[in-house]
Amino acid sequence: MSDIALTVSMLALVAVLGLWIGNWRIYGVGLGIGGVLFGGIIVGHVAHQYQIQLNDDMLHVIQEFGLILFVYTIGIQVGPGFFSSLRVSGLRLNAFALLTVFLGSVVTVMLHKLLNIPLPIILGIFSGAVTNTPSLGAGQQILTDLGSSTALVNQMGTGYAMAYPLGICGILLVMWLMRVLFRVAVDNEAKQFETSNGQHHEQLLTINVSVTNTNLQGLAIQDVPILNRDTIVCSRLKRGDELMVPSPHTLIQLGDYLHLVGAKNDLEQARLVIGNEVETSLSTRGTDLHVERVVVTNEKVLGRKIRELNLKQNYDVVISRLNRAGVELVASNQASLQFGDILNLVGRKTAIDAVADIVGNAQQKLQQVQMLPVFIGIGLGVLLGSVPLMVPGFPVALRLGLAGGPLVVALVLGRIGSIGKLHWFMPPSANLALRELGIVLFLSVVGLKSGGDFVDTLLNGDGVWWIGYGALITIVPLLAVGILARTLGKMNYLTLCGMLAGSMTDPPALAFANGLHPTSGAAALSYATVYPLAMFLRIMSPQLLAVLFLTL
């Protein structure tokens, strides 16, 4: 059998075994995608026993490409809401991530000083315990630059391999302990995130208001400040028995009924100004008005603001809501359209059909994946990750690496949405498929590489102690920060899990957190919020520790 056929066959075996292990449930909790790592360790051990040799270069390429696929699709998924998340809660989330990194470094220093663990070993255990491969590379590089022998530098890799599996299990254990300790109901946490935080947007509501304020008599809608905001849309007006779609120039009369869409606080302010909330129906049923949802797929309208389309003036149609990446937004005049946006239209049937033709409404396009933008994004991400970042006082340049670079680029491209005919929108099913494929490839190779020496070091060497040290470095900071964030910070459980996974730059942990509630984006959003800073700190920390240990 050729090297390629053998390697692919082994990876397939690892994936099948690992996914099967991941489906096991103990008290309702399983390893999920993390089971692939243990499938890899088992197959790697058997391959080592029977002296089955796999191509290391090929495995390395598959491992890195799998990681790139995973982080890129995560970035595309959370990109539309990432920057608003950063403004709203980014400081708090990154502060907790910083605390996690700091506490892990403190535990590492204590173990090194109290137990006299050799420097390469403790740095390797530290990198494995926090499941950060770039940290391992940075530590090995600085040890080499500081004059350590090749044998000592290689010991760091051994320590990493011993600590890595329990590093992944440790964070999953902490997530499970947090769930048990605080009696978390995951479905309730997801609902709380969607309603209270509204994906960092307030949930949109509707009310019907009767105009009783005499000061509004004869004023155009655009002349009423509360109705001229970007936070409220007046999508219907009923006068007598006539239901109409109002324009900014429509004159208000006493006794008119207005159908308003907006956030709770904005609607309450509008009610206080306009009049009284009423139960009178402003339904389009039985009238010549219709409400339909159409999707934006026409390249000609991408990037254009809603006001530029002049839908009300030209077609007597109002956009009452805009759904972007699952988030309901007020369709303000300043909002720019992106590929995949879903518009809630109110108007006459023929007019809505005309507007649908303008914005595209080609449902089949949403199921198509443009591969050109995918590889453009990956290529740009790899280039960004390879750019050296020189920090004064450090003997080596820092880099975002093959994980950080594609993530940052994907976040930016996901936020932009489209450039010309290139759309970075990806159907959820396609995004999930690529993401799962990436993480399975990555974990399969990590497991295969660790499996060869894992059992021997565990049974005949100091492996058990190394695993124990790694467990302390993994669990103590995560548990401390998790309890602090939940009790004092009142952090949503799914957001907390994503933040913990991001602070460890741990894709398998994120996959596990996403699996807790597959339809909620809370974990992925908080992961992406803290990941860039956490990756930078994880790369810096072993270098700082090496300098610290050698100078004290």
Swiss-Prot record:
Molecular function GO terms recorded: monoatomic cation transmembrane transporter activity
UniProt xrefs under InterPro entries: AAE_transporter (IPR050144), RCK_C (IPR006037), RCK_C_sf (IPR036721), Transpt_YidE_put (IPR023018), YidE_YbjL (IPR006512)
Membrane topology (UniProt): Multi-pass membrane protein
Localization in the cell: Cell membrane
Alphabetical list of SUPFAM superfamilies matching this protein: TrkA C-terminal domain-like
Domain RCK C-terminal, first and last residues per copy: 191-276, 279-361
Keywords: Cell membrane, Membrane, Repeat, Transmembrane, Transmembrane helix, Transport
GO biological-process terms attached to the record: potassium ion transport
One GO CC term, this protein: plasma membrane
Main location: membrane
Domain of life: Bacteria
Membrane-crossing residue ranges in chain numbering: 4-24, 26-46, 65-85, 90-112, 158-178, 371-391, 393-413, 439-459, 464-484, 493-513, 530-550
Record-linked Pfam families: Asp-Al_Ex, TrkA_C
NCBIfam families assigned to the protein according to its UniProt record, in alphabetical order: PRK03818.1, YidE_YbjL_dupl
Family listed: Belongs to the AAE transporter (TC 2.A.81) family. YidE subfamily.
Name of this protein: Putative transport protein ECA4401
Originating species: Pectobacterium atrosepticum (strain SCRI 1043 / ATCC BAA-672)
